[in-house]
């Protein structure tokens, strides 16, 4: 059995006895086959043959000279004259010169021969391939003929490698890989990367290793199908190029077929992965050589395998591919390179020596060289190697460049094992392990510094940014982008907000802390720059005695939580005064998986603001104290979808109403019907939760768009949400995939992202919450309430009443509708407000309001109170959206912002703007021009009353969930714009009145709700008939129908969606009649300030006469709605009640059909006091004027 040969790096020890060579006992003696053993082991051989390859030893063992080239590396002294005698003196002379050259070259191996465990200070200047070839040369026995042949071949190989090294020194490594893959692609082949290429080759082997013959198409499809789960980017084209690479390498045996594709069978010698991979690699190396590229084995290993462990493998491939002509070609290439660079190191002097080495025959059976040829070859190789070392040390731009470690890399952070165990490292300077303790500590320290300097959040610790920090009770400071203290609020138990502390309790919302923080700072900075529009002082909001929900939850890094109403009070969200931040900062880095916290406005805030330490991380979620109901996130966003993934810009909206019959649709819609919903239903969400923005099964998430003048907050206004019992099961599950952030109710589920269906109650059990809902409507639109009037930002809203939250409605304001906290204007074509109380088929949600284009205000939910008596009068909901003229519309259809159409702001994702149970098609094509739409345009789509209006909860398509909540009052406000400047007076009066009437309001609300339900079904028919009679009498007396022909016929009807919540005592009924008299009488005077005429596109409508035989009541009660002419039949329900025995129930009454016109609903507001000159009127721009 031949002995296993040692590794080439262990050339300083005997491969048989493993003893290190020395000059006494274990003298190194090289054999003709280039194996070197110690003299002791050589004398013990039984036969004169090499123990490794069984080559015969022709010369006497005692005559073979000692290899002093190796002895000098272990510290032995080389004698000047060696006692060796050849046939003649000339041979001895040539031998001495050649031996001296080899011994000189061996000195370059000195770093590999340091003492055991001791690192050598002088690192080798030669690369690892050069060192390996030099070891081969040093081990040659020049005395024997076989040894001289091997020495000549080793000299040639060393010279060829020298040329390659010199070319590599002049080559740009950045362009190397690009040039290589360009050459590979030019031949119809492709390399897919180390991991993917390896997997593809293994799959090809799996398909063909049994000798089966497949067509190229079938083979490619098989590989692609198996690759797709791990590599989704795999395609038939790319895999076909990989197969073509193997085809070029002659790995297949091809069988041609007539009029059919050829069959490919893997050759037997390539039916193992190692053989197939070697041939594959050899083909790529061959392509590189054809392209004239010089690539080192290290680079090959890195390119093809992604590591440095395959250098020897690649070197052997390179060596095998070398042809006798390749050396000469390399010399020519080097000459051209030197001409281009100017040759500062005078490398042209090496050209004769290189040409001499190139002329050596590399064949193993070549003729034995003469002694003179041996001497010349050794001198030539010594010269060129010296020239290479000199160039690397003195002229190379890459010479001894220290590799730059990446953060957290393992580069030189542990000691070299070869150095410890063998006493020397063959890798030299290229070793990725440390060779000394100083080097080890140096790189470990550098690694720590690089890790510490990685910035996770670029805006921390700058002016105006307050980071989050944990306090003792789990409270977290909000990220506020203001340069000054914006205001300090303390929530007290009596509902008063003081300015003492600015710490707010935060709750987690989704993930991506750094992304969310940067986004929040950006939005708050934008809000801060617009804060001057809100009033003289941004801190004026904190003067409110009534806690109001934040105007814009996410913009102030504070999202209201739908928590228990008895847990603390609501807090004011203060708009920052100013902000120094630019809003053009990129908002969305690619990934981060932390948690961002947002304010919970219902929690006590007793702590001062500490500063945030400079770390890049956020504290854990705040702990919930014992005995307190925990608040779940109000706005939940899934984190398993990449933020930057966008749907196609032209992606059609999903149709959530595909199950309805065609008669329920607006069949004359100018838009194409959307395709069917492509995602299945999502499991039901918890009670009060909005349908999610996207399904977590989708592969993209709707992105937030950035504009110059408006920051889209992608959040909903803080509002109370609808109980799950209102929805029927099928409808609820159908709408769970609608777009928009969804709210989570007070009940904390196990996981904020998991949907927990709650028990559904029958509709008849909702009666205790109807009055509460009507009382809390103002709270839900506070975010869109204050825009231009300085005092309007401080308008009060009704505080939370002790009754439970109302489950009566849910409004989905899409993320397209966003406003800043104070003063940010709409800068896009303004969308219509979708009202939850609308009738599904009429679409009072489709209103488009024509008003002053730039005077944009959205006031809502003003609590109107009597200045004298303190009794609560009414709440008038003024929903208004402004529409710019078409020439002022800056919207580009395919810009990065949302598309604005007559249906509102249309985002780039599949969304439905509002929750309704009727099939209203509210989609728009991108880029469609914004066109005003009047309600009368849609009158033909209102069908006659059918079975859908017959009962409250039997039909799944019934809109009674919404239409029974309130009446809609529509007023022609064409002449009101000129009086909009007087709205400030009323706002001031409202602010002064709120403190006197707060307690009375709560008491009246509580009393009204107790008495309301006693008259569940009484008098609803009588009230409606009485209402019609009273209206006709008022209209006949005042003749105000003749005063309203001043509007243009083509003018849009401006719709004011208003709901009157009437909770007044019995003594107010006579005053209400007086109020109507005042309003109807003055309407024809003050410049038509309140035109009571029913108008359809600017023309007065004919009045509809009711049957005079119906019973009549003595007062209007609280139904202040004028129901007038209607061409089609429109269902209207009586929704207002009064705490009297004959009042009307709002939650349990059946729908009542009457003849009204959708365009002719007139809003009659009531007087604030007994004075006839002091009453409120809705104005076109959303302000309220005190006449």
UniProtKB/Swiss-Prot annotation:
The record marks 509 as: Cleavage. Zn(2+) 1 binds at residues 14, 17, 38. Post-transcriptional repressor of mRNAs containing a conserved stem loop motif, called constitutive decay element (CDE), which is often located in the 3'-UTR, as in HMGXB3, ICOS, IER3, NFKBID, NFKBIZ, PPP1R10, TNF and in many more mRNAs. Binds to CDE and promotes mRNA deadenylation and degradation. This process does not involve miRNAs. In follicular helper T (Tfh) cells, represses of ICOS and TNFRSF4 expression, thus preventing spontaneous Tfh cell differentiation, germinal center B-cell differentiation in the absence of immunization and autoimmunity. The gene is Rc3h2. InterPro entries: ROQ_II, Roquin_1_2-like_ROQ, Roquin_domain, Znf_CCCH, Znf_CCCH_sf, Znf_RING, Znf_RING/FYVE/PHD, Znf_RING_CS. Pfam families: ROQ_II, Roquin_1_2-like_ROQ, zf-CCCH, zf-RING_5. Interacts with EDC4. Interacts with CCR4-NOT deadenylase complex. Interacts with MAP3K5; the interaction is probably stimulus-dependent. The modification Phosphoserine is found at residues 548, 806, 981, 1115. Keywords: Cytoplasm, Metal-binding, Phosphoprotein, Repressor, RNA-binding, Transferase, Ubl conjugation pathway, Zinc, Zinc-finger. This is Roquin-2.
């Amino acid at each position: 059995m031949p002995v296993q040969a040692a590794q080439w790096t262990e050339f300083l020890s005997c491969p048989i006895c493993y003893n290190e060579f020395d000059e006494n006992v274990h003298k190194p003696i090289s054999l003709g086959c280039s194996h070197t053993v110690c003299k002791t082991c050589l004398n013990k051989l039984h036969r004169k043959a090499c123990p490794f390859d069984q080559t015969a030893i022709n010369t006497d063992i005692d005559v073979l000279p000692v290899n002093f080239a190796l002895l000098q590396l272990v510290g032995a002294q080389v004698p000047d004259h060696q006692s060796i005698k050849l046939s003649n003196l000339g041979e001895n002379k040539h031998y001495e010169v050649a031996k001296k050259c080899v011994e000189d070259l061996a000195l370059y191996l000195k770093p590999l021969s340091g003492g055991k465990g001791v690192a050598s200070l002088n690192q080798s200047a030669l690369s690892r391939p050069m060192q390996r070839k030099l070891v081969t040369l040093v081990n040659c026995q020049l005395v024997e003929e076989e040894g001289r042949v091997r020495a000549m071949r080793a000299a040639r190989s060393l010279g060829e490698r020298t040329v390659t090294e010199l070319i590599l020194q002049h080559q740009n490594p950045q362009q190397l890989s690009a040039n290589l893959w360009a050459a590979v692609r030019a031949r119809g082949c492709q390399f897919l990367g180390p991991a993917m290429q390896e997997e593809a080759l293994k799959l090809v082997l799996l398909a063909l290793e049994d000798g089966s013959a497949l067509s190229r198409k079938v083979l490619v499809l098989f590989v692609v199908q198996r690759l797709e789960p791990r590599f989704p980017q795999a395609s038939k084209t790319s895999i076909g190029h990989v197969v073509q690479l193997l085809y070029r390498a002659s790995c297949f045996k091809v069988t041609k077929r007539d009029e059919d594709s050829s069959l490919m069978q893997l050759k037997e010698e390539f039916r193992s992965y190692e053989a197939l991979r070697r041939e594959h690699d050899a083909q790529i190396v061959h392509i590189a050589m054809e392209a004239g590229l010089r690539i080192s084995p290290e680079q090959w290993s890195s390119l093809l395998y992604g590591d440095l462990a395959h250098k020897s493998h690649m070197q052997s491939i390179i060596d095998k591919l070398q042809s006798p002509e390749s050396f000469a070609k390399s010399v020519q290439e080097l000459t051209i390179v030197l001409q281009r660079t100017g040759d500062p190191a005078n490398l042209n002097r090496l050209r004769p020596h290189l040409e001499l080495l190139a002329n050596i025959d590399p064949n193993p059976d070549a003729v034995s060289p003469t002694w003179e040829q041996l001497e010349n070859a050794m001198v030539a190789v010594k010269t060129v190697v010296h020239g290479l070392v000199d160039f690397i040390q003195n002229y190379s731009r890459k010479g001894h460049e220290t590799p730059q470690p990446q953060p957290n890399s393992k580069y030189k952070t542990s000691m070299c094992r070869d150095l410890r165990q063998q006493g020397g490292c063959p890798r030299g300077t290229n070793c990725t392990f440390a060779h000394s303790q100083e080097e080890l500590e140096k790189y470990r320290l550098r690694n720590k510094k690089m890790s510490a300097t990685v910035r996770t959040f670029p805006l921390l610790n700058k002016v105006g940014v307050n980071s989050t920090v944990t306090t003792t009770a789990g409270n977290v400071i909000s990220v506020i982008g203001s340069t000054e203290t914006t205001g300090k609020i303390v929530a007290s138990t009596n509902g008063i907000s003081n300015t003492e502390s600015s710490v707010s309790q935060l709750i987690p919302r989704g993930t991506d802390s750094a992304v969310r923080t940067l986004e929040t700072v950006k939005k708050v900075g934008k809000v801060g720059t617009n804060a001057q529009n809100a009033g003289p002082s941004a801190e004026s909001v904190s003067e409110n005695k009534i806690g109001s929900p934040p105007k814009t939850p996410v913009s102030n890094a504070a999202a209201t939580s739908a928590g228990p109403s008895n847990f603390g009070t609501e807090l004011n969200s203060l708009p920052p005064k100013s902000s120094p931040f630019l809003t053009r900062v990129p908002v969305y880095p690619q990934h981060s998986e932390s948690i961002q916290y947002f304010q919970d406005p219902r929690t006590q805030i007793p702590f001062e603001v500490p500063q945030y330490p400079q770390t890049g991380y956020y504290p854990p979620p705040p702990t919930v104290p014992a005995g307190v109901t925990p608040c779940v996130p109000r706005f939940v966003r899934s984190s398993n979808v990449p933020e930057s993934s966008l749907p196609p810009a032209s992606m059609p909206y999903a149709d959530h109403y595909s199950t309805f019959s065609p008669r329920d649709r607006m069949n004359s819609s100018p838009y194409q019907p959307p395709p069917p919903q492509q995602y299945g239903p999502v499991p039901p969400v918890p009670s009060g939760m909005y349908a999610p923005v996207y399904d977590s099964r989708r592969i993209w998430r709707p992105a937030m768009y950035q504009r110059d003048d408006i920051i889209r907050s992608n959040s909903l206004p803080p509002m109370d949400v609808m109980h799950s019992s209102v929805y029927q099961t099928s409808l609820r599950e159908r709408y769970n995939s609608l777009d928009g952030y969804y709210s989570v109710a007070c009940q904390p589920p196990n996981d904020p992202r998991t949907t927990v269906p709650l028990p559904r109650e029958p509709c008849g059990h909702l009666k205790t919450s109807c009055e509460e809902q009507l009382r809390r409507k103002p709270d839900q639109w506070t975010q869109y309430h204050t825009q231009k009037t300085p005092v309007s930002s401080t308008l009060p809203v009704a505080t939370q009443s002790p009754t439970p939250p109302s489950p009566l409605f849910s409004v989905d304001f899409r993320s397209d509708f966003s406003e800043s906290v104070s003063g940010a204007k709409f800068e896009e074509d303004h969308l219509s407000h979708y009202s939850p109380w609308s009738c599904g088929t009429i679409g009072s949600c489709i209103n488009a309001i024509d008003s002053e284009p730039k005077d944009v205000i959205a006031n809502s939910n003003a609590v109107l109170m009597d200045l004298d008596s303190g009794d609560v009068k009414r709440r008038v909901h003024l929903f208004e959206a402004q529409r710019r003229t078409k020439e002022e519309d800056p919207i580009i259809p395919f810009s990065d912002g949302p598309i604005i159409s007559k249906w509102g702001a249309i985002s780039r994702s599949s969304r439905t703007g509002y929750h309704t149970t009727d099939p209203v098609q509210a989609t728009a094509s991108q880029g469609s021009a914004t066109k005003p739409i009047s309600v009368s345009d849609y009158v033909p789509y209102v069908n006659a009353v059918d079975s859908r209006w017959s009962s409250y909860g039997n039909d799944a398509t019934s809109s009674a969930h919404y239409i029974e909540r309130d009446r809609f009052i529509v007023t022609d406000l064409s002449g009101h714009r000129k009086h909009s400047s007087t709205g400030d007076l009323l706002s001031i009066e409202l602010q002064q009145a709120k403190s006197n009437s707060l307690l009375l309001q709560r008491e009246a609300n509580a009393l009204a709700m107790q008495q309301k339900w006693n008259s569940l079904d009484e008098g609803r028919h009588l009230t409606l008939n009485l209402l019609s009679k009273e209206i006709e009498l008022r209209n006949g007396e005042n003749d105000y129908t003749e005063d309203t022909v001043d509007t243009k016929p083509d003018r849009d009807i401006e719709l004011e969606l208003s709901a009157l919540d009437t909770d007044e005592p019995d003594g107010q009924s006579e005053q209400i009649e007086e109020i109507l008299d005042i309003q109807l009488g003055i309407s024809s005077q003050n410049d038509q300030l309140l035109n009571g005429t029913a108008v359809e596109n600017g023309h007065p409508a004919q009045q509809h006469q009711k049957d005079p035989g119906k019973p009549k009541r003595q007062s209007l009660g609280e139904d202040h709605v004028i129901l007038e002419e209607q061409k089609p039949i429109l269902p209207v329900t009586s929704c207002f009640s009064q705490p009297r025995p004959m009042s009307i129930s709002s939650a349990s009454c059946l729908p009542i059909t009457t003849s009204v016109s959708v365009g002719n609903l007139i809003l009659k507001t009531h007087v604030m006091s007994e004075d006839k000159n002091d009453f409120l009127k809705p104005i076109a721009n959303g302000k309220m004027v005190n006449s």
